[in-house]
């Protein structure tokens, strides 16, 4: 199905030249003279590169043949990540470039969304909020009560996030995986 210029928005998936892209950023421009156009930054699902593309009135792009499947992350071995389809129990292996930034939020057994393009896995999406245990952070000191102050904390997946001073090593916290921000302690 063709997608018109007026339908473009952030997060929309499109296909150009047989390559699937996600719109990362877009701006609708109405110049004083001439027709309006959309300037967009689009990210390739295949290689992760971001390019800038201009769409003019009347331009159309195709909706990619993408399927999202819920899969279970099993384990990481070298530069490959193993996943299992929770419906068919079929296992697939993805490399570092296909998993990308999602790897720093994935725990063994976690359910993730794997994106397939023409039946080939191309990317992994983790939940927007994950609960992870802090394995290393600086201890608290008397007087560290300013709510605006933060300290780095290493999570069980190896990711490092900034947390308030009252958060201690060994505690489990919720983190927004898109902004990489601390949300709250898990009770």
Swiss-Prot record:
Subcellular location: Cytoplasm
This protein's GO CC annotations: cytoplasm
Keywords recorded for this protein, A-Z: Cytoplasm, Elongation factor, Protein biosynthesis
Coiled coil: none
One of the record's GO molecular function terms: translation elongation factor activity
Pfam families: EFP, EFP_N, Elong-fact-P_C
Record pathway: Protein biosynthesis; polypeptide chain elongation
An individual GO BP term: peptide biosynthetic process
The keyword Membrane is assigned to this record: no
Entry annotated with the keyword Oxidoreductase: no
Major location (coarse): cytoplasm
UniProt xrefs under HAMAP family: EF_P
Function: Involved in peptide bond synthesis. Stimulates efficient translation and peptide-bond synthesis on native or reconstituted 70S ribosomes in vitro. Probably functions indirectly by altering the affinity of the ribosome for aminoacyl-tRNA, thus increasing their reactivity as acceptors for peptidyl transferase.
Similarity field: Belongs to the elongation factor P family.
UniProt name for this protein: Elongation factor P
Native species: Helicobacter pylori (strain J99 / ATCC 700824)
Upper lineage: Bacteria, Pseudomonadati, Campylobacterota, Epsilonproteobacteria, Campylobacterales
């Amino acid at each position: 199905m063709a997608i018109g210029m007026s339908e473009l928005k952030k997060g929309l998936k499109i296909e150009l030249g047989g390559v699937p892209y996600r719109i990362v950023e877009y701006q609708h421009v109405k110049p004083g003279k001439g027709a309006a156009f959309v300037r967009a930054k689009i990210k390739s699902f295949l290689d992760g590169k971001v390019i800038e593309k201009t769409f003019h009135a009347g331009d159309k792009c195709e909706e990619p043949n993408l399927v999202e499947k819920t899969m279970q992350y099993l384990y990481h071995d070298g530069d490959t990540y193993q996943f299992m389809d929770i419906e068919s129990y079929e296992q697939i292996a993805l490399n570092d470039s296909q998993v990308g930034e999602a790897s720093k939020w994935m725990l063994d057994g976690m359910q993730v969304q794997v994106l397939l393009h023409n039946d080939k896995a191309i990317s992994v999406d983790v939940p927007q909020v994950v609960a992870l245990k802090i394995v290393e952070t600086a201890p608290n000191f008397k007087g560290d009560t300013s709510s605006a102050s933060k300290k780095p904390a290493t999570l069980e997946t190896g990711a490092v996030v900034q947390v308030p001073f009252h958060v201690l090593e060994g505690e489990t916290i919720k983190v927004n995986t898109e902004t990489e921000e601390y949300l709250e302690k898990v009770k």
